[in-house]
Amino acid sequence: MSTKSMIRDVELAEEVLSEKAGGPQGSRSCLCLSLFSFLLVAGATTLFCLLHFGVIGPQREESAGGPSINSPLVQTLRSSSQASSNKPVAHVVADINSPGQLRWWDSYANALMANGVKLEDNQLVVPADGLYLIYSQVLFRGQGCPSTPLFLTHTISRIAVSYQTKVNILSAIKSPCHRETPEWAEAKPWYEPIYQGGVFQLEKGDRLSAEINLPDYLDYAESGQVYFGIIAL
């Protein structure tokens, strides 16, 4: 119903009731009806204005494509997933036959070297310029806690082709022991994993290494617990 129709109906009702009303009681009834009619007309007019100017009502529909995402990382990952599968990639694992040191190996079942990445001098050599995801995980294991503080470090370093200086790009340190195990107490085993990862702009010829400070604590019990890799984006 439009606002004009509502006003017309109210006026007709006022005329009918005015004819039937008489005396003081009728005057009071007419006054109440007039006040009610005024409020009704004012409310209807306000509602019409709000609807007309779009203050209330259905919201504007979003564009068919949804909100635009302009994050550089999102765009990079999206374009990378749509590209061909000739991107450089490497995933090397720890050599379980080299106790006392962390040696990377690319010949195990779950290792991967593709599209130009090389493993030289225990370092991954980048074959092309671009953005790369660099990641690594190590797992430490021990029995009891010594009297001296025990700190475990895991560091990923880069030697850029443009400046032959070793620079740490990812680093973490953990301490599995908060106090010494008493001589009379049972030495309980502990485990301490460290995972690191990040996206970096690399150049062709850059060398990447993943190292730890205490290789004697490395846990080789399960395959795939200690690894290092890069993925071109």
From Swiss-Prot:
Membrane topology: Single-pass type II membrane protein
CDD domains found in the cross-reference section: TNF
SUPFAM superfamilies according to UniProt: TNF-like
GO biological process, one term: extrinsic apoptotic signaling pathway via death domain receptors
Residues lipid-modified (N6-myristoyl lysine): K20
A Pfam family annotated for this UniProt entry: TNF
Residue intervals of the THD domain: 88-233
GO molecular function, one term: tumor necrosis factor receptor binding
Residues carrying covalently attached carbohydrate according to the record: S80
Principal localisation: membrane
An example Gene Ontology CC term for this record: extracellular space
Cited PANTHER family: TUMOR NECROSIS FACTOR, TUMOR NECROSIS FACTOR FAMILY MEMBER
Protein's UniProt name: Tumor necrosis factor
Annotated organism of origin: Bubalus bubalis (Domestic water buffalo)
Gene: TNF
